[in-house]
Amino acid sequence: MRNDLETLKHIIDSSNRITFFTGAGVSVASGVPDFRSMGGLFDEISKDGLSPEYLLSRDYLEDDPEGFINFCHKRLLFVDTKPNIVHDWIAKLERNQQSLGVITQNIDGLHSDAGSQHVDELHGTLNRFYCNACHKSYTKSDVIDRTLKHCDNCGGAIRPDIVLYGEMLDQPTIIRALNKIEHADTLVVLGSSLVVQPAAGLISHFKGDNLIIINKDRTPYDSDATLVIHDDMVSVVKSLMTE
């Protein structure tokens, strides 16, 4: 492990165009449940009697707007979550002008909360909301502080700005993410199993020097990586920052 940390530190210190690609594992230490792991959010919301895929779908929003709103308020608004050391480390490297930014599969908004400026949120963010009817914009604090569920302009359902099942990923976001990957000298994957498509397929566009994967479980890209660390990333980053 120590040799891996030394290698990781050397690569990070010698890189000036790092792109980060993050998944659910990054936010677990902040109290955000991993969607797909055993005991994760999908397991938990399955207890509601409807499939998680349906509850997080465009169809459910259209079939039962009130039910969809209530589900979002009950299950998705992580009020007390704060960035952890991994989010802070990524933001610090961006401030130090070593990083091109971060691409994330997460919807919790914690990268932005940590101070990262160049964040491509592939699946949207819970930091923004909008009316499903008239598209008036709302912030997360609007929704939480005022317990807003319906638009004060037209009465429509206020939905989070996330990509639901049955909706397409935002193409400008995909283009920005591809640009970050294609121009990176080092790509660091953190807390992602790299199996959810099409987002995970972006990794195949990396042509730089070093692919680093830090994840508890194996990924389909492990054999292509310069360095693979199967460990808790909070522990890895803490150790890295004390090296």
Swiss-Prot record:
Name this protein carries in UniProt: NAD-dependent protein deacetylase
Role of this protein: NAD-dependent protein deacetylase which modulates the activities of several enzymes which are inactive in their acetylated form.
Gene name of the record: cobB
Signal peptide: none
Cofactor binding remark: Binds 1 zinc ion per subunit.
Cofactor(s) annotated in UniProt: Zn(2+)
Cellular component per GO, a single term: cytoplasm
Organism for this UniProt entry: Staphylococcus aureus (strain Mu50 / ATCC 700699)
GO molecular function, one term: histone deacetylase activity, NAD-dependent
